[in-house]
Amino acid sequence: MTITYEWRGEFANQAVNALHAEGFEHPHLEIDWHTQVYRHSLGWVCARSGDSLVGFVNVAWDGGVHAFILDTMVSGAARHRGIGTGLIAAAVEHAGAAGCEWLHVDFEDHLTAFYFQACGFTATNAGLIALPDGRGPGAH
C-alpha cells in the first residue's frame, strides 16, 4: 500500500466523518469538517491510498506560535503501518514552516506510546477544566 500525505488536501466531509466514527467508536455524524478546518485550523493532513482517504489529522492554532493536534485518525484496515506517525510528521513539518514554535497534543492513556515513542512528543504539565454544558465555570 503506497500512502501519500497532503497538507491542506481536499477531502469529502463524508470520508472524514466515516474515519472519525470508526476511530473514535461513535455513530456516524454529519459534521461539516470543511467549515470547521477552514475557519479554525492552521491546516490538516490527508493520508491517501490511491483515491481513498485512510488518515486525517487536524492542526488547530492560536494564530501565533502554538499549534494543536486534534482528531488523529486512521482507518482500521490501514492501522499499524506507520500512517499515524506519517500524519504527525507532516503536521510537525508544516506547523514549523508556518512559524509555530510549539505543537501540543492531548490523548487517552492507551495512545501514550504512539505520541511519546513513535511521534516524539514529551510529557508536560497541563491543566484541564471539563465543560459539560459548554459554558464553563462562572458562565451566566
How should each PLM-predicted stretch be described?
Residues A97, E101, E108-D133:
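Conserved active-site alpha-helix within GNAT-family acetyltransferase domains
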Residues D32-G50, G55-M73:
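A conserved beta-strand-loop-helix scaffold within acyl/acetyltransferase catalytic domains
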Residues M1-I31, C46, P137-H140:
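Short amphipathic alpha-helix that is part of the acyltransferase structural core
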Residues R8, L70, D106-F107:
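Small/polar loops that bind or transfer phosphate-bearing groups
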